[in-house]
């Protein structure tokens, strides 16, 4: 491991000065940050992310964190001898699996991240979409074409949900009291059934309801890549749809970009897909001229 470069006091002051207009831009604005399970990585990475979230709050930004946990869920299921199955990029979640998913997301990852933020000097509150009926959901359905018969079939994903409504009562109270909400992507149906919700989709629904200034999707890739695998720094909704249609955007990036489009259509000003493994990625995106990742806008 190489030593970090030494920055002179003058350079440190210059960096802070250059960040001022960006800080003013986001003053009292709400930023929703989806922190993916792959982006969490090691403990030091998660703690650095937590410090950056506290810094945002200290600069009068209102951060709302939504976290994933796919790798951690997979690890726990493997330990318990429960096989993981996926369809259309979503985990098929049966009755046994939803209990593990809730335990890992709301009981382990959520509280760990809350602890890191509080340790860094923030005041975080850990919740999931079930708390206060914050996020209500309905059963998600997907279709797939059978490769042999070419017949379209409906896939039963089990207890996987799609957000239907976001009640902002609890979130607005927390934000108004300068607390940092940390949300696990679980929701409940009208009948009280718990649903596992894709974290990107959950974050998009929350950001749209809040009319957030920015939605940041921290993942394990640099952003949207072109056909030469180079980062595309900026896209309009129209551009993004063209890239989906011609196959440039494919695989797991499609639902991420569709979440971005949905959030923008709900009133979010801009959405960024960026690499959460890059140190201080959130600060680089919000407080520097260059930014990082791919910005998608109207």
Swiss-Prot record:
What Enzyme Commission number(s) appear in the record?
2.7.2.8
Q: What is the lineage of its organism?
A: Bacteria, Pseudomonadati, Pseudomonadota, Alphaproteobacteria, Hyphomicrobiales
Q: Where in the cell is it found?
A: Cytoplasm
Any one GO MF term held by the record is: acetylglutamate kinase activity
Q: Which UniProt keywords apply?
A: Amino-acid biosynthesis, Arginine biosynthesis, ATP-binding, Cytoplasm, Kinase, Nucleotide-binding, Transferase
Task: Please give the CDD domains that the UniProt record associates with this protein.
Answer: AAK_NAGK-C
Q: According to its UniProt record, which reaction does this protein catalyse? A: N-acetyl-L-glutamate + ATP = N-acetyl-L-glutamyl 5-phosphate + ADP
- Would you tell me the protein name for this molecule? Acetylglutamate kinase
Give residues annotated as binding substrate.
69-70, 91, 196
Q: Which gene encodes it?
A: argB
The site feature described as Transition state stabilizer is recorded at 34, 256
Give a yes or no for keyword Nucleotide-binding in this entry. yes
Gene Ontology CC annotation, any one: cytoplasm
Task: Give the protein's function.
Answer: Catalyzes the ATP-dependent phosphorylation of N-acetyl-L-glutamate.
InterPro entries, per this entry? AceGlu_kinase-like_sf, AcgluKinase_fam, ArgB, Asp/Glu/Uridylate_kinase, NAGK-C
Keyword Ribonucleoprotein listed = no
What's the short name of a Pfam family annotated to this entry?
AA_kinase
Q: What class of enzyme is it?
A: transferase
The signal peptide stretch is none
């Amino acid at each position: 491991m190489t030593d970090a470069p030494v920055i002179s006091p003058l350079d440190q002051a210059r960096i802070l000065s250059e960040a001022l207009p960006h800080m003013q831009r986001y003053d009292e604005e709400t930023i929703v940050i989806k922190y993916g399970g792959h982006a969490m990585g090691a403990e030091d990475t998660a703690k650095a992310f937590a410090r950056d979230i506290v810094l945002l709050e200290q600069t009068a930004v209102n951060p709302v964190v939504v976290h994933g946990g796919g790798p951690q869920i997979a690890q726990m299921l493997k330990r318990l001898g429960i096989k993981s199955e996926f369809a259309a990029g979503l985990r098929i979640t049966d009755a046994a699996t939803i209990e593990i998913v809730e335990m890992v997301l709301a009981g382990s990852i959520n509280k760990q991240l809350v602890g890191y933020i509080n340790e860094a000097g923030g005041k975080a509150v850990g919740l999931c979409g079930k708390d206060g009926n914050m996020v209500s959901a309905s059963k998600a359905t997907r279709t797939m074409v059978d490769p042999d018969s070419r017949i379209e079939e409906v896939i039963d994903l089990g207890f996987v949900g799609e957000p239907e409504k976001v009640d902002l009562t609890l979130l607005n109270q927390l934000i108004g009291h300068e607390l940092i909400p940390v949300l696990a992507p679980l929701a409940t149906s009208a009948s009280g059934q718990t649903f596992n919700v894709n974290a990107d989709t959950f974050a998009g629904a929350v950001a749209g309801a809040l009319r957030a200034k920015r939605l940041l999707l921290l993942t394990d890739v640099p952003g949207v890549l072109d056909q030469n695998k180079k980062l595309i720094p900026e896209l309009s909704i129209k551009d993004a749809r063209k890239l989906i249609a011609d196959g440039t955007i494919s695989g797991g990036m499609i639902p991420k970009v569709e979440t971005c489009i949905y959030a923008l259509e709900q009133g979010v000003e801009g959405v960024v897909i960026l690499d959460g493994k890059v140190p201080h990625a959130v600060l680089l995106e919000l407080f520097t001229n260059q930014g990082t990742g791919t910005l998608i806008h109207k």
